[in-house]
Amino acid sequence: MKKLHFGVLISMMIVSCGDFVSNDTDGISDTVYVPLQGLDQVAIVDVDSGEVDTINIDYSQGSNTPHFIVIDEINRYWFVTTISSGYVGCYNLDTDELIDTVLVGDSPALMALNESSAKLYVSRMMPMGGMMTGAVSTIINEIDYSNPVDMFSSNEFEVSSPAPHGLAINQEGSEIYVISNTADWLYKIIIPENEETEQIVGVVMDVNSPNIEFSNIEVDRLKPIQCVSVNNSLLVVTCSAGITYDLYSGNDTIPGHIQLWDTVTMTLLDTVQFNWKSKPWHIINSPVNEEAFVALSGDNLYPRSAGVACLTYASDTLAINWETYSEDFEALHGIDVSADGKNLFVSGRGDGNLHIFHADSGEKIKSISLGHNPSAAGISTVYK
């Protein structure tokens, strides 16, 4: 495995609604793992020093396109999906050495893991947002990594909608949640014990959708991207929406949505809307407060449409706590939060930076360059 290392100059840029950058740049001891789709690499960023190591992702000839990373801090592994070559790779968290890969095919996208059972769940998607080309799928893979040198696909769950992308697991590890990027349907999969058959419950995410009774029909309206389980009965979902096409009226615009769902009854509790240019993308739950943080991808034709937002979900009600926008942000993609809940890390797929923010206010601390046209995607952070 080839490992590259280079120093990065930290740029202090003017940002946000108040055009203010915090001068608090020291003492952040987190390491952020960033898949660089455009370079077939994973960047390992020391946030405090601004130094970046890179690992080449070369599981197959041609493009691999590393897309999303999750970290198992208990068993000390990290995993990456490659949407072009169809692999999931497992690495040692302490040495960053490759341990094993498993071929799942059909454009593996997002992941959720159960650290206690050493099971990894992987969504397999179809092309979306012009980011890649690949196969249509309706499959969620379960990967057993209890023996990490010999990972294997231990189960498959099939939903009735195409392009499953967003994926989350509840705190008990008993249920996984899946959203279709093209059909606007949400699924709850009750994970089977032993040889039992899984139970799958599906609901449409928009009661006005033309496919309310036909989950296999693609409507491309809400275009949900990611979901996060914030407790054992609540799920927060991002819907990128934006420009959509209607057979009768032609092009239309739909505001970006954040939805709050009750996963026991599978009912929609509340919705917050942004403007149609916002494109809510990845989302992460605060480890200390009843808050979720959202990367707003934005529209490249509209400066200051990309940003970051904090939403509260107390009393089963969504409310925007703060929003931060800047012309320096382009196509924000991945987002994660430090274990103490104090700092946010956001990747810019378009601007090529890792942005660091104060989680309580949205003030930007600094930005770290990830190279030339890296197309940074779904990130994960760990305290080392």
PLM region spans:
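Sec-dependent signal peptide recognition
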Residues: 2-9
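Accessible peptide chain termini
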Residues: 1-2, 155
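C-terminal motif of bacterial Sec signal peptides marking the signal peptidase cleavage site
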Residues: 13-16
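Predominantly soluble domains enriched in secretory-pathway, periplasmic, or organellar proteins
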Residues: 18-384
